[in-house]
């Protein structure tokens, strides 16, 4: 009977490590006190700034810093600034403040760079437009020179013709009507003003007797032919390469492009420029490889 009797722990004899549950836990798990909160005093604080406020920070200081409006340099209530608009933070404080703020300017610049068009494509477009305008002016000069050579014949200035009495300003007005030739573009419909042809003053300076009515009868047909050939040579000299490209392109046109108008100079110009820049890109890619 005595062996089956249960003895409660509080009636057990207090000896050794079994006399207290707290001591038993303490032997296996030593408990250390939490570190106390420590406050660091700010250097270079004058006694005038302290005033009646205690220098020891409290929970009120934490609330005051949280309620401060965008002042990351605020520390405690004792750090008062009577003249707020004249106070300037030190460079070290500014560096700490800038380091704590994320750099959003770099991400904005990247987004703007993605939205903007690529610079190589823009420069290529401007080059195409410049070359197209140059070709327009050259073709307009050729057409004007052809019209002038067709109207300027030996019969026009011959002594026995009926047109001897006609004044030269009429010829200038017809020249002005021919120089207003404009080629329509596929991409843009703006008209480009063609500069005046240098063949008109060249013609008048080469044969000043032809410009005067009283000396028209003395101008021979050989001098007229020389003047016309000189003006035509000056206008056609710089267009031989372009006309050769046009001729090659007309010969190598596919049957699928039969719907396009072969007489349209804008289509021919755009095709020549497209092939020219395609060859340039192939050469650049080969050099890079």
Swiss-Prot record:
It is found in: Mitochondrion outer membrane. It is a peripheral membrane protein. Keywords: Membrane, Mitochondrion, Mitochondrion outer membrane, Phosphoprotein. It comes from the Eukaryota. One of its GO terms (biological process) is aerobic respiration. The modification Phosphoserine is found at residues 38, 100, 107, 221-222, 235, 258, 270. It holds the Pfam family Mito_fiss_reg. The keyword Ribosomal protein does not apply. InterPro entries: Mtfr1 (IPR007972). This is Mitochondrial fission regulator 1-like.
